[in-house]
């Protein structure tokens, strides 16, 4: 603490002092609230809403509203908010982060600002890290809100669309960060407004805010579908990776060293940089790969896939560790959250890494995925009008919260003084010595009935310690990713006298560890950390499990110089010091210099990780700006705006683009390339092809005007084919949405490829982020043009079927399809794809675009007890209207280009291809169907 802080207090202390008059005001209202009956207290909600309508603000209502919630908590739950909890509630309402120690009642604190902000009627989201906590908090804390007349909802992983919508429409909604983000993405993929589940993002309170906004910031939310790519290459690369020999580099290759042409002496077939988690082939390794795959040059563009996959295989074998980064369960690879130790079902590593690990562990390799929609938590939570956060540890990341999220961190004083004793780190030479010391410490504490919580970083370590304790006859519980189902129960019992619990990382976070009287008298909960984490914040979270609400407790970290943190980031001088001191085996060292070295190593990693997250945000900000534009335009279409004028503008723009591209007034019309112009425009807008006669003696603008008139006339003729104009309006909306989605998905992939390669710009002394922005801008404009052209192409070539068939569709009966049964079934396979996301197959097809709530299996869509098939391209079905839309003048046939003569075989091939390109949507009451088989099949 510097001199300024000693005199004036820390910034948090000054903020708390500034808030105290407001707290005094809330407490002064306590006698008035106690006099009110339950009905009168409930009536305050109606009174507050009326006062808001009359012009008062939430800040005006705050003292009285908080006093009402405080009294309701006492009557409903028997829990009255402490003064420090009132302070925390005010901080959250102000859109800041309240750092509150473990056991200070953060869950109860959230009821204060959530009630106040829910009075506006726009919805409040209370965000937690898992379904268990969301459900628990909704059931317990929701009673306060319901008592006061507010509605409370909870969104869980297995809920259906209607249940989610009902929950989001409540005044206060408890939900996990993952469900919240995925629902946002799915809402921006729906075809009809009625399929939306979320309201606008108004105000959220994020519990464990550091876990969500810091730890998970590097992991984007992705909804994906299978890409159809073969998995054979992963198997081949895995075989080769096991044959390659790991070597060493004389020193790390920096960018400057590469630019200056410094030579790095390497041994073996590949080298591993564990700090940056990078694997590079040596020259010797490159030759072996080329020989294995019988290729001449691995660096050739055509061999990029092999190069990428062999790198993935080497990463899987050398940087991804079983029972640390992932577990194998039921012939499946399940990712372990590095910060919580929990399994993350349904999540998969992207870019082929998951498939490489599947090949390594000899489980079934699932096909690679294609990204359909993605967003990072950084950008998602910045969409809220206001957000607040709670955690036990945030001050160490205060700069990041302020720079990226514009949120201040305020330390809230504890209700009772913390009397936990935090011992100096115990440092040993080897891991073996360290683990022996840990077991001895557990045995010693257990002998006096003191409960012990042992925190490990990996599952492997937790199982090793479990075996060692068994040999000592110590009864204990193990809590890691393999046994996470019993998490809450095991953690809640960890404070009982004589209890010994081994937990991976912060498993059990959010569940209080309460001491019994015997345990309290034995010294309280003993925390033993078996390794320092990369982040000081995670270490502080582990320590914070002990000493809640003034309880006794103690903590100590046991470290060896063989730990990853010390090996990769600690100074080599420490090993020399140990050696020079002649430290005996099993001898423990405690020294200020050692503690400082460990802290400096952690600071170095924290700074490095912050840089990575900041860099990710710089790139994702570009994606986010484009995403905002696309989603905004998409929502306008979804909201039912009349698209006729927009379509006409697309027609005008498309004609302008190609006229300007192909014709010039500076060149005589006889020299214009009419074939090129007809080849690019007429497939989009079927105007009459231009000929030398039709353009003779005309200026460019004259031709432009004639083409626009003809294009508009053609579209008006198309509109006249529809019994009702609204049918075409509906079609315009559906087609445009489908084109936007299709092109946006491709654009996401292109942007990722661009980002992966843009780092090379640094070698040319150019800023990669600036280069990325410029390239992304050009790509975005190309995508917009492509959306317009595809939309027009589809709209100009749709055709309304005969009424009898339309009526059958409308009644949901089987429809005769003019197509080949065999071709149709061939198209089915591998086309309808469920989008895999966190824990679930997403309620949206990869290509078919079925609405949320459908279940996708083997190309068949089942919904509301009905059954149907979707085709290779987005289906077009005017909902509630008796119409079937197909492409081409006849189903399965496309118009011939004027003036072309084609053979019968060529015509047949084109007709067959057209059948496969046609959109079809068939809905029937069962599996019965009627198809015709083409001559070819």
Q: Residue locations for each model-derived region?
A:
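Conserved P-loop NTPase motor core
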Residues: 1-582, 632, 648-649, 653, ...
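Basic, mixed-charge low-complexity alpha-helical segments
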Residues: 10-21, 898, 905, 909-910, ...
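Histidine-centered active-site/metal-ligand motif
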Residues: 125, 476, 747, 878, ...
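Cys/His-enriched microdomains
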Residues: 871-874, 913, 932-935
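Cysteine-centered motifs
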Residues: 823, 934-937
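Extended, charged helical/alpha-beta scaffold domains that provide interaction surfaces
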Residues: 326-334, 340-347, 549-550, 557, ...
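Intrinsically disordered, low-complexity cationic segments
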Residues: 824, 873-876, 920, 930
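Charged, low-complexity alpha-helical linker segments
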Residues: 909-927
């Amino acid at each position: 603490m510097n001199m300024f802080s000693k005199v004036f207090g820390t910034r948090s202390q000054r903020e708390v002092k500034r808030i105290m008059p407001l707290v005094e005001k809330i407490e002064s209202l306590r006698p008035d609230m106690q006099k009110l009956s339950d009905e009168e207290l409930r009536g305050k909600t109606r009174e507050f809403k009326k006062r808001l309508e009359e012009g008062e603000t939430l800040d005006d209502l705050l003292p009285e509203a908080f006093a009402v919630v405080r009294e309701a908590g006492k009557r409903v739950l028997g829990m009255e908010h402490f003064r420090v909890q009132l302070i925390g509630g005010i901080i959250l309402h102000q859109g800041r982060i309240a750092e509150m120690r473990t056991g200070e009642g953060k869950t109860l604190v959230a009821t204060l600002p959530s009630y106040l902000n829910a009075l506006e009627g726009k919805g409040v989201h209370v965000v937690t890290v898992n379904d268990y906590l969301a459900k628990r908090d909704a059931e317990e804390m929701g009673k306060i809100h319901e008592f006061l007349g507010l509605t409370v909802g909870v969104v869980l992983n297995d809920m259906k669309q209607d249940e989610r919508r009902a929950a989001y429409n409540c005044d206060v909604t408890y939900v996990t960060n993952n469900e919240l983000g995925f629902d946002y993405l799915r809402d921006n993929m729906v075809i009809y407004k009625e399929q939306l589940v979320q309201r606008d993002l108004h105000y959220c309170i994020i519990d464990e805010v550091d876990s969500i906004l810091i730890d998970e910031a590097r992991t984007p939310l992705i909804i994906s579908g299978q890409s159809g790519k073969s998995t054979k290459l992963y198997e081949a690369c895995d075989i080769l990776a096991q044959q390659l020999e790991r070597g060493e580099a004389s020193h790390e290759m920096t960018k400057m060293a590469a630019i200056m042409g410094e030579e790095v002496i390497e041994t073996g077939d590949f080298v591993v940089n564990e700090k940056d988690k990078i694997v590079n082939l040596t020259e010797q390794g490159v030759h072996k790969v080329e020989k294995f795959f019988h290729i001449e040059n691995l660096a050739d563009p055509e061999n990029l896939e092999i190069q990428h996959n062999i790198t993935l295989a080497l990463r899987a074998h050398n940087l991804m560790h079983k029972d640390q980064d992932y577990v194998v369960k039921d012939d499946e690879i399940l990712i372990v959250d590095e910060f919580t130790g929990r399994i993350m079902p349904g999540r998969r590593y992207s870019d082929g890494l998951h498939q490489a690990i599947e090949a390594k562990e000899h489980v079934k390799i699932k096909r690679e995925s294609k990204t359909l929609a993605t967003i990072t938590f950084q950008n998602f939570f910045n969409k809220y009008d206001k957000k607040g956060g709670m955690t036990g540890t945030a001050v160490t990341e205060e700069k990041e919260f302020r720079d990226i999220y514009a949120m201040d961190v305020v330390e809230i004083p504890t209700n009772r003084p913390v009397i936990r004793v935090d011992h100096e780190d115990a440092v040993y030479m080897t891991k073996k010595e360290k683990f022996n010391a840990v077991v001895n410490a557990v045995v010693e504490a257990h002998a006096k009935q003191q409960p012990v919580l042992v925190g490990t970083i990996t599952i492997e370590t937790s199982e090793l310690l479990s075996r060692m304790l068994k040999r000592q006859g110590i009864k204990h519980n193990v809590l890691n990713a393999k046994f996470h189902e019993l998490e809450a129960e095991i953690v809640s019992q960890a404070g009982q006298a004589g209890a010994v619990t081994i937990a991976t990382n912060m498993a059990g976070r959010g569940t209080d560890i309460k001491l019994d009287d015997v345990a309290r008298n034995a010294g309280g909960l003993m925390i033993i950390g078996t390794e320092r984490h990369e982040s000081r914040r995670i270490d502080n979270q582990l320590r914070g499990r002990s000493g809640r609400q003034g309880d006794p407790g103690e903590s100590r970290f046991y470290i060896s110089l063989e730990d990853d943190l010390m090996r990769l980031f600690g100074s080599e001088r420490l090993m020399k010091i140990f050696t020079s001191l002649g430290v005996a085996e099993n001898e423990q060292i405690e020294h200020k210099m050692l503690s400082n070295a460990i802290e400096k190593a952690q600071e170095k990693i924290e700074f490095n990780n912050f840089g990575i997250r900041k860099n990710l945000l710089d790139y994702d900000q570009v994606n986010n700006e484009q995403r905002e534009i696309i989603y905004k335009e998409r929502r306008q279409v979804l909201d039912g705006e009349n698209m006729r004028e927009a379509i006409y503008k697309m027609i005008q723009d498309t004609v302008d683009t190609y006229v300007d591209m192909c014709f010039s007034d500076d060149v005589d019309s006889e020299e214009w390339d009419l074939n090129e112009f007809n080849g690019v425009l007429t497939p989009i807008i079927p105007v009459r092809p231009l000929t030398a006669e039709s353009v003779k003696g005309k200026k460019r603008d004259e031709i432009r005007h004639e083409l626009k008139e003809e294009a508009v006339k053609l579209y008006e003729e198309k509109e006249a084919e529809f019994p009702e104009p609204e049918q075409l309006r509906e079609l315009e909306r559906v087609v445009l949405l489908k084109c936007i989605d299709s092109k946006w998905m491709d654009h996401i992939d292109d942007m990722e490829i661009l980002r992966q390669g843009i780092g090379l710009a640094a070698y040319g002394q150019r800023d990669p982020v600036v280069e990325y922005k410029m390239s992304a801008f050009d790509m975005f404009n190309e995508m917009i043009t492509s959306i317009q052209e595809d939309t027009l192409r589809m709209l100009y070539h749709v055709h309304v079927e005969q009424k009898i068939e339309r009526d059958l569709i409308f009644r949901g009966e089987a429809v005769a399809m003019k197509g080949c049964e065999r071709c149709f079934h061939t198209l089915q396979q591998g086309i309808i794809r469920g989008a895999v996301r966190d824990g679930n197959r997403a309620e949206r097809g990869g290509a078919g675009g079925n609405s949320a709530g459908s279940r996708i299996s083997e190309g068949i869509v089942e919904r509301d007890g009905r059954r149907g098939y979707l085709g290779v391209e987005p289906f077009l079905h005017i909902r509630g209207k008796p119409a079937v839309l197909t492409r081409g003048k006849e189903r399965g046939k496309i118009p011939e280009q004027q003036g072309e003569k084609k053979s019968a075989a060529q015509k047949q091939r084109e007709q067959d291809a057209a059948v496969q390109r046609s959109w079809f949507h068939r809905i029937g009451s069962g599996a019965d169907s009627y198809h015709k088989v083409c001559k070819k099949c």
